[in-house]
């Protein structure tokens, strides 16, 4: 049984940077927390907790120590609160997310009605929106733009993991309304590259394994894309979930992983697949 690992499986730049910053902070003596999970990987979160870095949902019960800002970013008000409490802040917000926050702040201050293309329930989007003063709308698609009230000049940014096609559909709808439309392409291509690679790999194999947190939106999307092409697709978080029966009649297995999946988990899965291979 041949096993093919996608070249870009695993950590993207922003996640790698955030986890490095978190593990470095964990080595210090003072009390340290992450505001929300540092990334959408329960295994990384657990590892940090073992090192004494807990997760807090908000800062209401925190009066001192170090707070690590997660890769998705946090609300502007939460960042202000951390500074007001004179906590040591380790800002591990992905630089691409930071740029989106800054663009919303600028557009809002410059009098634009702001559209954020993305998932309103995602913490990254909630953080980006919070940097606007008022008249900031979250839209998931071009169709939703049609339902918005009449606007003046419009500014558009996107959740970093959105597809370019979706951003384009929103911008097209904004242009139809007339008036000034200012667009910042804040999409990071790490998601698109992983999705394209997974699409190509799923076409070549008899079975796909997608590794990553069940709470990771980008990993779930990878699993959906692979399933559409190869129905024998399995989304797992760890090697322990692998079932030998999945590989009956299988000659080739493709493996990919979400942008928040650490290398050690990918390595464990590859080792487990070697064991399965050797037992046949």
UniProtKB/Swiss-Prot annotation:
Protein name, UniProt field: 4-hydroxy-3-methylbut-2-enyl diphosphate reductase
Biological or metabolic pathway of the protein: Isoprenoid biosynthesis; dimethylallyl diphosphate biosynthesis; dimethylallyl diphosphate from (2E)-4-hydroxy-3-methylbutenyl diphosphate: step 1/1; Isoprenoid biosynthesis; isopentenyl diphosphate biosynthesis via DXP pathway; isopentenyl diphosphate from 1-deoxy-D-xylulose 5-phosphate: step 6/6
Record InterPro entries: LytB/IspH
The enzyme's E.C. designation: 1.17.7.4
Cofactor binding remark: Binds 1 [4Fe-4S] cluster per subunit.
Gene Ontology molecular functions: 4 iron, 4 sulfur cluster binding; 4-hydroxy-3-methylbut-2-enyl diphosphate reductase activity; metal ion binding
Record flagged with keyword Nucleus: no
Disulfide cross-links: none
Protein's organism: Trichlorobacter lovleyi (strain ATCC BAA-1151 / DSM 17278 / SZ)
Named cofactor requirement(s): [4Fe-4S] cluster
Pfam families, alphabetized: LYTB
